[in-house]
Amino acid sequence: MSRRNTAKKTKRADKFDPIYQNRLVNMVLNRIIKHGKKSLAYRILYRAMKQIQQKTEKNPLLVLRKAIKEVTPRLIVKSRRKSGSTYQVPFEIKPNRGKILAIRWLLKASRKRLGPNMESKLSYELIDATKGKGKAIRKKEEIHKMAEANRAFADYL
């Protein structure tokens, strides 16, 4: 490969969803997709947003943002081997990585939740997350507790 004429990277255009025109909604949408069924993912997300609007009488986009903000972790723990022992070392994470984890935890908690369909389960989980309840919030608190307990190993980066 020639080093003189290296190709310049083009900035990827951020994709937005057609209704809310929001990147965060698109991030959630892409993680709902299973087996390439994007139209089903759109239907699930938009119906969940409509249910949030009906239940809370607030802007569903604000509820989604607040839920993700509440669930976003600041620290995670990673396993590191040092002299034959494995330590759980706490790491600070970048905001984008935190959002991705928060979305993943919210969707996982929604899927495990009892309910008639995914739309209602997702809407209830998002509403609970804004109130500071739910399995996704519990997961974040669990991760933060583990990071706090292993703070002594923070030097083993």
Swiss-Prot record:
Cross-referenced PROSITE patterns: RIBOSOMAL_S7
Record family assignment: Belongs to the universal ribosomal protein uS7 family.
Location(s), subcellular: Plastid, Chloroplast
Biological processes annotated in GO: translation
PANTHER family (alphabetical): RIBOSOMAL PROTEIN S7
Keywords recorded for this protein, A-Z: Chloroplast, Plastid, Ribonucleoprotein, Ribosomal protein, RNA-binding, rRNA-binding
Pfam family, any one: Ribosomal_S7
Protein name: Small ribosomal subunit protein uS7cz/uS7cy
Subunit structure: Part of the 30S ribosomal subunit.
InterPro entries listed in its UniProt record: Ribosomal_uS7, Ribosomal_uS7_bac/org-type, Ribosomal_uS7_CS, Ribosomal_uS7_dom, Ribosomal_uS7_dom_sf
